[in-house]
From Swiss-Prot:
Single GO molecular function: acyltransferase activity, transferring groups other than amino-acyl groups
PROSITE patterns: GNAT (PS51186)
Enzyme Commission code: 2.3.1.-
Family membership noted in the UniProt record: Belongs to the acetyltransferase family. YpeA subfamily.
Name of the protein described by the UniProt record: Uncharacterized N-acetyltransferase YPO3031/y1452/YP_2654
Highest classification ranks of the organism: Bacteria, Pseudomonadati, Pseudomonadota, Gammaproteobacteria, Enterobacterales
Natural source organism: Yersinia pestis
Length: 141
């Protein structure tokens, strides 16, 4: 397995991966999400590759106060082999190198498997409520 920074040629393969991982939602256009990421800290957008095939991804961010992680996904055929742990670990190292004191991760409430994985990596449920407001409405995907 190789973990590397996303490249423009990975575009379609990553979107297909996200489809396999059930990460896509109608209100989020994945092409726009990638384009936005490529314009802001693209070196925090990581992919895991096996024999030239992308099998995992994580899209990280850092605003100078907190880090974030989105689109963590591992192809179903490759789950349980440590790919997600490796992606998060690499992202954590990149964030620490930037002086990031804390990484916040949003997970859907019903995603018990992913919550369990993060708990094994010493992440804890926080007593906060996340609020959001859509500022730009993407075209439905």
């Amino acid at each position: 397995m190789e973990i590397r920074i996303f490249q423009q040629d990975d575009f379609e393969e990553v979107i297909l991966l996200w489809e396999h991982c059930d990460l896509l939602r109608p209100w989020n256009d994945p092409e726009m999400d990638i384009e936005r990421k490529l314009n802001h800290d693209p070196e925090l957008f990581l992919v895991a590759e096996v024999n030239g095939t992308i099998v995992g991804s994580v899209m990280g961010g850092y605003d100078g106060h907190r880090g974030s992680a989105y689109y963590l996904g591992v192809h179903p055929d490759y789950r349980g082999r440590g790919f997600a742990n490796a992606l998060i670990s690499r992202l954590e190292k990149k964030l620490i190198a930037r002086g990031c004191p804390k990484l916040n991760i949003m997970v859907r409430e019903d995603n018990d498997a992913v919550i369990g994985m993060y708990e094994k990596l010493d992440y804890e449920t926080q007593d906060t409520i996340m609020l959001g407001k859509r500022l730009i409405v993407d075209q439905e995907y």
